[in-house]
């Protein structure tokens, strides 16, 4: 996986590219879930690039993966801020010409907010997997269980494999839902 860092608004963001560049083909931008990062996409980006002939770009938001840490708690507007402020800068920086945003969970919400708030003619489509359009008690109960597993089980150890700042990644996600 060819990774490189992007400097965006004073933050270092981990990014990776698969397949052709933005001058050669449309680009599919992957937006990860609340505890995700570039590495957790595993071989999906390479397979997606091969199957579609498109370039695929993924990045780890600040606080995740190998990206810069962030101060906690996150503001409740963090997904809106990412969609309206950070994502447009990333698209510009990578030379995004046209393509789609593909998001899972928090990433799907960010893609949805971006599509609704930014009139970006380069974004031709969005594919959303489990965006946060409403909250269910079952989901909140699962997030509380994740906190228990993180604090008293082995979830922290497992996440530390993927996140340089594991407490930042976990509590940035968990706290946004439970605080």
What are these regions (language model features)?
Residues 52, 58-98:
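Active-site loop/oxyanion-hole signature of alpha/beta-hydrolase fold enzymes
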Residues 1-12:
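N-terminal cap/lid segment of alpha/beta-hydrolase-fold proteins
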Residues 14-69:
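Conserved HGGG/HGGXW glycine-rich cap/lid loop of the alpha/beta-hydrolase fold
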Residues 131, 135-136, 140-179:
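The alpha/beta-hydrolase serine catalytic core
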Residues 44-49, 73-75, 119, 142-146:
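Glycine-rich, phosphate-binding/catalytic loops in enzymes
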Residues 97-136:
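Conserved hydrolase catalytic core segment
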């Amino acid at each position: 996986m060819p990774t490189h860092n992007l400097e965006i608004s004073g933050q270092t963001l981990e990014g990776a590219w698969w397949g052709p560049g933005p001058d050669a083909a449309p680009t599919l931008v992957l937006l990860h879930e609340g505890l995700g990062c570039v590495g957790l996409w595993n071989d999906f980006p390479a397979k997606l690039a091969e199957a579609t002939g498109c370039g695929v770009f993924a990045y780890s938001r600040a606080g995740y993966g190998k990206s810069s840490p962030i101060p906690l708690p996150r503001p409740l507007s963090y997904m809106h801020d990412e969609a309206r402020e950070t994502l447009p800068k990333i698209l510009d920086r990578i030379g995004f010409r046209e393509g789609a945003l593909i998001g899972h969970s928090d990433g799907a919400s960010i893609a949805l907010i971006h599509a609704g708030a930014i009139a970006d003619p380069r974004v031709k489509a969005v594919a959303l997997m489990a965006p946060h359009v409403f909250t269910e008690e079952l989901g909140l109960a699962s997030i509380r269980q994740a906190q228990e597993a993180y604090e008293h089980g082995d979830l922290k150890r497992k996440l530390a494999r993927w996140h340089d700042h594991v407490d930042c990644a976990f509590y940035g996600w968990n706290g946004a839902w439970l605080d």
